[in-house]
């Protein structure tokens, strides 16, 4: 369960950070 959460976070957090900071 935790590895799945970590995998999803690793996949989506960069996109969210990119959208917020406008640095892609």
From Swiss-Prot:
User: Highest taxon of the source?
Assistant: Eukaryota
Give me the disulphide-bonded residues.
18-24
**What's the chief localization of this chain?**
secreted
Q: Which UniProt keywords apply?
A: Amphibian defense peptide, Antibiotic, Antimicrobial, Disulfide bond, Secreted
The listed locations are:
Secreted
Query: Pfam families attached here?
Result: Antimicrobial_1
Q: Among the record's GO biological process terms, what is one?
A: defense response to bacterium
Q: Which GO terms describe its cellular component?
A: extracellular region
* Tissue and organ distribution: Expressed by the skin glands.
- Protein name in UniProt: Brevinin-1Ba
Write down the species.
Answer: Lithobates berlandieri
């Amino acid at each position: 369960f935790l590895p799945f959460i970590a995998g999803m976070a690793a996949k989506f957090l960069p996109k969210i950070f990119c959208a917020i900071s406008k640095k892609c």
